[in-house]
Amino acid sequence: MAQRTRLGDILRPLNSEYGKVAPGWGTTPVMGVFMLLFFVFLLIILQIYNSSLVLDTFKVDWRSLGL
């Protein structure tokens, strides 16, 4: 038999929904939107890394940051 601990008693409410599934699609469309946004973010980072996204109009200078 499992031993009851104080930490287990604190975490038990987080597991109270175990086995219950929301009917329908639930939050799947929201997850899809965030996955798409994350993919676009990674694509932009990859293009900057490969220099295929030209950023010549942005001048980066440490003095412009006021440091």
From Swiss-Prot:
GO biological process, one term: protein stabilization
Compartment annotation: Cellular thylakoid membrane
Any one Gene Ontology molecular-function term assigned to this protein's record: phosphate ion binding
Residue ranges crossing the lipid bilayer per the database entry: 29-49
Subcellular location, principal: membrane
Origin superkingdom: Bacteria
Keyword line: Membrane, Photosynthesis, Photosystem II, Thylakoid, Transmembrane, Transmembrane helix
Membrane topology per record: Single-pass membrane protein
One GO CC annotation: plasma membrane-derived thylakoid membrane
Complexes and interactors: PSII is composed of 1 copy each of membrane proteins PsbA, PsbB, PsbC, PsbD, PsbE, PsbF, PsbH, PsbI, PsbJ, PsbK, PsbL, PsbM, PsbT, PsbX, PsbY, PsbZ, Psb30/Ycf12, peripheral proteins PsbO, CyanoQ (PsbQ), PsbU, PsbV and a large number of cofactors. It forms dimeric complexes.
Function according to Swiss-Prot or TrEMBL: One of the components of the core complex of photosystem II (PSII), required for its stability and/or assembly. PSII is a light-driven water:plastoquinone oxidoreductase that uses light energy to abstract electrons from H(2)O, generating O(2) and a proton gradient subsequently used for ATP formation. It consists of a core antenna complex that captures photons, and an electron transfer chain that converts photonic excitation into a charge separation.
NCBIfam families: PRK02624.1 (NF002728)
Family: Belongs to the PsbH family.
Protein name: Photosystem II reaction center protein H
Native organism: Synechococcus elongatus (strain ATCC 33912 / PCC 7942 / FACHB-805)
